[in-house]
A protein has these predicted regions:
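Ubiquitin-like/PB1-type beta-grasp interaction modules and other compact soluble beta-rich domains
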Residues: 1-65
């Protein structure tokens, strides 16, 4: 278990990478933008991007409408 910061809030997680974290949080791939320690990531980068204790994640849910 590691402690990371997600959207400014501390959170304990067992996720080993960004893809696992996105799934753990219930987001749908393609419906969320992810920034990891200040770097914006493409969804193709999520599976290989390891999470470490103290990392900072910003998530932005995309919504369409009119």
């Amino acid at each position: 278990m590691k402690t990371i910061t997600v959207n400014g809030q501390p959170r304990d997680t067992a996720a080993h990478d960004i893809a696992a974290l996105v799934a753990e949080l219930g987001f749908v791939k393609g419906a969320v933008l992810v920034e990891h320690n200040g770097t914006a990531l493409r969804p193709t980068e999520w599976p290989g991007r390891a999470l470490n204790d103290g990392d900072t994640i910003e998530l932005l849910r995309l919504a369409a409408g009119g």
